[in-house]
C-alpha cells in the first residue's frame, strides 16, 4: 500500500509539473497572438518598414527571413548529411571520434551571440563579406550544424542493422547500401530535424545582428543580378530579418507605433515557427508511413 501511495504521489507531482509547463507555454503563445493578431493585415505583411513614421510593414524583413533560411539550408544540409553519414556509418570507435563528438556537443551549446561575434570577426571582417546574407547564412550554419549533424547521425543509427546486412548480402557496396537502403529508411527523422532546424534559423536574431546587418534596403524586383545589392536574390546585400526587426524596433524606439509593429511582427514570427514545428511532426509521420508502408 505504501508503494502504491508513493507511486500515485509521484505521478501526481509529475503531471502537475507538466501541467504548469504547458500552462506557461500556452499563456505565452496566447499573449503574443492576442496582442499581435489584431495588427496583422495584408498591407502590414507586404508593406515597407519605416524608421521614423507610423504605418510601416514587414514585407522586406519577411522575405529576407525566408531567403536567408533557404541559403542557410543550402549550405548546412549537405554538410550535416556528410558529417552525420561519416559518424554513423564510417567512423571507427576511438579517441579521435570521441573528440569529434565532444566538439559537436560543445558547439551545439554555444550561445548564439557568441556565434554571431565569431561570424562578425571571420566572415564580415576577415573574409570581407561585410554585413550580408552570406555572412549571416555562414554564421547560422556554424550555429545549427552541430545539431543537424547529430540529428542525421541519430536517424541513421536508428535504422536496424539487418537493413544494412540485407543490402550487403545483395552484393552492393557499402556506400550504395547507405544511399539506397539506410538513408531512405532514416529519411523521415532527417527531414523532421531539418524542418525543426528551419524554425530555429527563422527565429534567430542575435547571430544575425552582427553578420546580416540591421537594415533592409529597398529591393528592385526587376533586378535579377545576383551581384547587385538591390537584387532580391543577391547574397551580398544587407538583410534585416523579422527577428532582428523586432529587436531593433523595441531597442531603438524611433517609430511612433513601435509597440504595434513589434506586437504584429512577433505574432507573425510565432505563427511561422509554430508552422515549422507542427509541420515537422506531420511531415515526419507522413514520410515514415509512406516509406515503411505502415
Predicted regions and their residues:
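Hydrophobic alpha-helical transmembrane segments of multipass integral membrane proteins
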Residues: 63, 67-75, 79, 83, ...
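Transmembrane-helix boundary motif in ABC transporter permease subunits
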Residues: 72-104, 280-289
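Periplasmic/extracellular loop-to-transmembrane helix junction in inner-membrane transport proteins
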Residues: 1-13, 32-74, 93, 248-259
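Transmembrane alpha-helical segments of polytopic membrane transport and secretion proteins
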Residues: 1-20, 281-294
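Transmembrane alpha-helices
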Residues: 174-214
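Generic hydrophobic transmembrane alpha-helix motif, especially the helices
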Residues: 105-141
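Interhelical loop and adjacent transmembrane-helix boundary motif
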Residues: 52, 208-269
Amino acid at each position: 500500500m505504501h508503494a502504491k501511495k508513493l507511486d500515485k504521489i509521484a505521478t501526481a507531482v509529475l503531471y502537475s509539473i507538466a501541467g504548469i509547463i504547458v500552462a506557461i507555454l500556452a499563456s505565452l503563445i496566447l499573449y503574443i497572438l492576442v496582442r499581435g493578431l489584431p495588427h496583422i493585415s495584408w498591407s502590414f505583411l507586404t508593406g515597407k518598414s519605416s524608421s521614423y513614421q507610423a504605418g510601416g510593414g514587414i514585407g522586406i524583413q519577411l522575405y529576407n527571413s525566408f531567403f536567408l533560411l533557404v541559403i542557410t539550408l543550402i549550405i548546412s544540409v549537405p554538410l550535416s548529411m556528410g558529417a552525420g553519414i561519416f559518424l554513423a556509418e564510417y567512423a571507427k570507435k576511438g579517441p579521435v571520434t570521441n573528440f569529434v563528438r565532444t566538439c559537436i556537443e560543445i558547439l551545439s551549446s554555444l550561445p548564439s551571440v557568441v556565434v554571431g561575434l565569431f561570424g562578425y570577426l571571420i566572415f564580415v571582417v576577415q573574409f570581407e563579406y561585410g554585413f550580408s546574407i552570406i555572412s549571416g547564412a555562414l554564421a547560422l550554419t556554424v550555429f545549427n550544424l552541430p545539431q543537424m549533424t547529430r540529428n542525421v547521425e541519430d536517424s541513421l543509427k536508428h535504422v536496424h542493422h539487418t537493413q544494412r546486412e540485407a543490402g550487403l548480402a545483395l552484393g552492393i557496396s557499402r556506400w550504395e547500401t547507405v544511399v539506397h537502403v539506410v538513408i531512405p529508411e532514416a529519411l523521415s527523422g532527417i527531414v523532421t530535424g531539418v524542418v525543426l532546424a528551419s524554425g530555429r534559423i527563422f527565429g534567430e536574431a542575435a547571430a544575425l545582428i552582427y553578420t546580416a546587418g540591421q537594415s533592409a534596403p529597398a529591393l528592385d524586383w526587376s533586378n535579377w543580378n545576383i551581384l547587385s545589392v538591390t537584387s532580391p536574390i543577391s547574397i551580398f546585400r544587407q538583410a534585416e530579418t523579422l527577428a532582428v526587426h523586432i529587436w531593433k524596433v523595441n531597442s531603438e524606439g524611433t517609430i511612433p507605433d513601435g509597440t504595434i509593429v513589434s506586437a504584429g511582427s512577433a505574432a507573425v514570427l510565432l505563427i511561422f515557427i509554430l508552422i515549422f514545428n507542427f509541420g515537422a511532426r506531420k511531415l515526419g509521420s507522413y514520410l515514415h508511413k509512406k516509406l515503411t508502408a505502415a
